[in-house]
A protein has these predicted regions:
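Acidic, metal/ion-coordinating pockets
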Residues: 2-111
Length: 111
């Protein structure tokens, strides 16, 4: 969910997506109705190991896909200090931390 298309259908569409996923019992990461929801990992037990899945999205601040705040919906922000602190926090609690990141400049080739 942490990607630049989260708000393609506007604020109502983003909220509706979260509502439907929750109603259907589909776990999701990287976006939510506030930063607490957007930053909450999905936890799975795999071969007796607890694994935390986190998702972050880098973006240039254009305003079209805002980062979540304490009171506003959005995506889980991807900036160095924050990502490192989140990984460290969850490494203390779980056997593994898997980070899914969405970043890069749109419409550019790989170099």
């Amino acid at each position: 969910m942490a990607n630049n298309h989260y708000f393609d259908l506007g604020l109502d569409g983003a909220r509706h997506t979260i509502q439907l996923l929750d109603e259907l019992g589909v776990q999701h990461i990287g976006a939510g109705n506030n930063i607490k929801e957007a930053s909450t990992p999905v936890i799975k037990v795999i071969h007796d190991k607890k694994v935390a899945f986190l998702a972050f999205c880098y973006k240039e601040h254009t305003g079209w896909c805002p980062w979540a705040t304490e009171t506003e919906p959005g995506i889980n922000p991807m900036y160095d200090d924050y990502v490192v602190s989140e990984i460290r926090k969850y490494k203390k609690q779980y056997d593994y931390v898997v980070v899914i990141s969405h970043w890069g400049k749109e419409h550019t080739g790989f170099t």
